[in-house]
């Protein structure tokens, strides 16, 4: 067909429909020619050479091209893998700025690779492939970006009021009985009133979604075993929502559906945080396919080994690392982040393996260009930024090292709280730090307790139920002979591996689940709950379900009584936290009086009621401790400048196996007060019938349990 090509504009990158036609623009520094490829409904291809190039941006405007048009690029240039160049115009490439993508990667043959499969393994990536792959790869889509937000804005929930719920778009609703079957596992499924009602009743304020950037499942390795890339940590584009989660269509309808989901969640008071993977792409190492950035300009977008540019630096364990040091790569990331905030109304981001983004040359640098440009951006200054503060490279564990404006997944919190409740020695001091927001990690560079994203479980590892039911991972279903997944789970099965009908073991496991949830919700910092933990979700001991798109990963909404009780206990905990600012302070504890009174804002005690000494923190076998939190000593005023006060509380932690009698503290007159029992984790719910402890009474705390008392005035 005849297509009239106008010169068009350099910006914006990608495809942009102006109501009369569409502008196309692609950055490639080393290309010698670029072809725009249009596809009709029958997949017939029309190629149009982009003749205009300015500042390495190839561009053109096509009148009459409208939303729903599918397209891709073929990029010509040198095939010199030893020098890092892997141009091959036989490969149709996804537009890195495409706002929608139609279709999934199909087939498992040699066509999608830039090199030939006809040579020996050690040399095959050096030989140019003559095979065309347009019939196998997803197509970019022109979209109309207009949407009636009806006044919707970012919620800007204060950090100290935030409760995060991490979940998977498909897994959360795939089996929900009250959601129409055609909507389950989709953006529309999350927007359904039944899904939102569950989150609202829990008290969730922020939904953290596992990757929704369009990702690929490479054919072969997983698909040959009947598995797939379920988690989605192999992005192939950073603007398009994954089309596989759309109930309405894949020619731009998925964008509208995603926006409708965000709007529905915002109306319910729930923010949307995206798990984003800017550290690598799904193209893998030198033996991976050419689907987008590799074929567009490999030396620009990826970090290559200096003395052998055929190979890729890999700080992620996924075969490649984006070269964030190049201005165009930084621009790609920043344009993507701004797009999701301004066009999709997303409230924040969790950066997967964020340390990889801060590497300059080889070392992680908290003053890197990535942080500089993030901190200067007025759009991103208003959203939540969360780092997974590590990568797989040398020196990659950076917990506590990120700069201001950033919160971090606190991996030390997870490890310490797990160790404490399984009865490990020498954990008291670390546990106390973690319970108070980890000031030893986050207070030194000007950050506050909200820098610590506290979690006990996350998508990567055991669920809460499995944490107290398995001591070893059981990943046989992944097809890797149980060799994948972390061996160091800090878990305890309570005496039997896996399922059991022993009532004592079941009672202990239920108590431990409540201990973990109560510790999480009553700690300073920001709690993150793994979706499904509130209802006892199990993965049968699999701690790495990245490839399990089945009932092993999907939520089971048919709950027994124990799990119904756990849901209600979790609701009560979250409501309690939201009612009491003493558990979500905006400033650090001082360990001294703040408003001139004789009682410190926090005091730690032995079970006998005496104050902890420096020496006692180092008693390795001690596994029981008490803490007093003074609600009259809150350092931050209300938004109107008024002084805030709260109730005061005593908490008793007993990680020993036997019951311990705790005496009420004998200092500051605390033994002269009456105390009301609020939580005892040996019970399935919050205490309903009032139980009062007076000064001469000891408080029995059964083994492996937590008790919370409220001071009566």
List where the protein language model places each region.
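Carbohydrate-interacting/catalytic domains
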Residues: 1-165, 170, 500, 506-512, ...
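Conserved, mostly hydrophobic/aromatic
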Residues: 26, 73, 167, 209, ...
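Short, flexible loop/turn elements at secondary-structure junctions
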Residues: 28-30, 52-54, 64-66, 77, ...
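Short, polar loop/linker segments at the starts of domains and inter-domain junctions
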Residues: 47-48, 177-193, 470-475, 640, ...
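A generic secondary-structure signal for well-formed alpha-helical elements
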Residues: 69, 77-79, 171-176, 203-211, ...
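Substrate-binding/active-site clefts of carbohydrate-active enzymes
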Residues: 133, 168-346, 353-379, 396, ...
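Structured core elements
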Residues: 164-166, 208, 230, 273, ...
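Conserved alpha/beta catalytic core and glycan-binding cleft of carbohydrate-active enzymes
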Residues: 345, 366-531, 536, 544-548, ...
